[in-house]
């Protein structure tokens, strides 16, 4: 699919998203907004749209980076346990700093997510798997262990409601003043694009990339830092978006190949389009109620993930 088609589709979905909701708002109202309509548009609908686009494109890039540096098409922040580590970090920040600002929570979540990513990569270095499918299974098992620890702590200290809010991604609570931290993902996306060629070289293996003059460890560490920061920002702001970083890069690689700089713009747009589509679908299925974006992405994403597992020889 060409970039211009993805961009046009994104614009169509974005405009549609602005006018879907319990509060009536039509395109004609834009020419003469009442105080209530202006509040709905600028305090709720536009912040929600912006957060959807940023979360979708940034989490898709996270998956693309992780698949490159791990050299496995089934690795993503979901299957590597990164999201579970970030959630545990947020929970720990609530215990240690009861009145912590969102920035402090994000930093603690980042430290935990980064530690989890390093642990996952160390496991991959120490254990060589003949079948590529075992690598994400290790990440999923590790993530389940971390998730169980987080749930235990949450029950022990009566924080289970907080954990549940991050377990299912939800854009319904995104309003002006509660999503701006996501803007920090934008410079990280730019850095990812600058390092795109280096990530592509790193995906060829340590010995090969070092022979080409690449500082392999440094590039891998930068990639893990970008992934950990973005994951922490997204989970803290909107919650978990499972399988997003897994399916979007794989879909793009089918028709764009594995060159990261070439596939990154398509990954960005397709990620935003996919999340926006899932959000709109979740808002209209049981209107005026809505299904959380985490559930919609999880259902559709897990279906695509299962399909890729069945076709793993084609994607490995």
UniProtKB/Swiss-Prot annotation:
It is a multi-pass membrane protein. Gene3D superfamilies: ABC transporter involved in vitamin B12 uptake, BtuC. GO terms for cellular component: plasma membrane. CDD domains: TM_ABC_iron-siderophores_like. Keywords: Cell membrane, Ion transport, Iron, Iron transport, Membrane, Transmembrane, Transmembrane helix, Transport. One of its GO terms (molecular function) is transmembrane transporter activity. One of its GO terms (biological process) is siderophore-dependent iron import into cell. The keyword Oxidoreductase does not apply. The chain crosses the membrane at residues 5-25, 49-69, 94-114, 133-153, 181-201, 224-244, 268-288, 290-310. It is found in: Cell membrane. InterPro entries: ABC_BtuC-like, ABC_transptr_permease_BtuC. The keyword Transport applies. Disruption phenotype: Disruption mutants are unable to use petrobactin for iron delivery and growth. Pfam families: FecCD. Part of the ABC transporter complex YclNOPQ involved in uptake of ferric-petrobactin. Petrobactin is a photoreactive 3,4-catecholate siderophore produced by many members of the B.cereus group, including B.anthracis. Probably responsible for the translocation of the substrate across the membrane. Belongs to the binding-protein-dependent transport system permease family. FecCD subfamily. The complex is composed of two ATP-binding proteins (YclP), two transmembrane proteins (YclN and YclO) and a solute-binding protein (YclQ). This is Petrobactin import system permease protein YclN.
